Amino acid sequence: MAKRVYAIAMRYAQALHELAKEQKSLDKWQEDLQNLSRLTEDASVDEFLSNPKIVSARKHAVLAKLSDIDPLMLNLVDMLVATRRLGIMRAISGEYNRLLNEARGVEDAIVTTAKPASEADTEIIRQQLSKITGKKINILTATDPGLIAGLKARIGDKLIDGSISRRLVLLQNEISQGRI
């Protein structure tokens, strides 16, 4: 089921990305998708939009008043409501961001540290990851005291684990196998 949702979201995102390129509105549409994603995650908004008793024109008008969203983006919401796919808005937004980053040579990295990293440390990490990947890096930070020290960086499907907890596990394995 998740693969199917992803495939559907990917098709919508690709179509939106192409249309946004034609309209020269890549950043505006990214912002609109993020806003719509946040809006549709609100239970009351989702309930309103999913209510079949409320006509589409009314839903469209309410959304238009709620935010400064491109009319073509409102058409997307209308289509998702009509096909009962509003629940994939977040996936569409995420996939659109991925396509936009890919086109710009940017990659997201989730960097987890034992305690919050300073801005200077984050910048050093960004530079090092940029050297490794050859791309610009957006860093999303997280903390996990279980790492003890060091960091883990997830870039796409790759994981760089430079944490002390990982080194301790490796050392424990070496000892248990009699190598040390």
UniProtKB/Swiss-Prot annotation:
GO terms for cellular component: plasma membrane; proton-transporting ATP synthase complex. It is found in: Cell membrane. It holds the Pfam family OSCP. It is a peripheral membrane protein. It comes from the Bacteria. InterPro entries: ATP_synth_OSCP/delta_N_sf, ATPase_OSCP/dsu. GO terms for molecular function: proton-transporting ATP synthase activity, rotational mechanism. Keywords: ATP synthesis, Cell membrane, CF(1), Hydrogen ion transport, Ion transport, Membrane, Transport. Coiled coil: none annotated. Belongs to the ATPase delta chain family. F-type ATPases have 2 components, F(1) - the catalytic core - and F(0) - the membrane proton channel. F(1) has five subunits: alpha(3), beta(3), gamma(1), delta(1), epsilon(1). F(0) has three main subunits: a(1), b(2) and c(10-14). The alpha and beta chains form an alternating ring which encloses part of the gamma chain. F(1) is attached to F(0) by a central stalk formed by the gamma and epsilon chains, while a peripheral stalk is formed by the delta and b chains. F(1)F(0) ATP synthase produces ATP from ADP in the presence of a proton or sodium gradient. F-type ATPases consist of two structural domains, F(1) containing the extramembraneous catalytic core and F(0) containing the membrane proton channel, linked together by a central stalk and a peripheral stalk. During catalysis, ATP synthesis in the catalytic domain of F(1) is coupled via a rotary mechanism of the central stalk subunits to proton translocation. This protein is part of the stalk that links CF(0) to CF(1). It either transmits conformational changes from CF(0) to CF(1) or is implicated in proton conduction. NCBIfam families: ATP_synt_delta (TIGR01145). This is ATP synthase subunit delta.
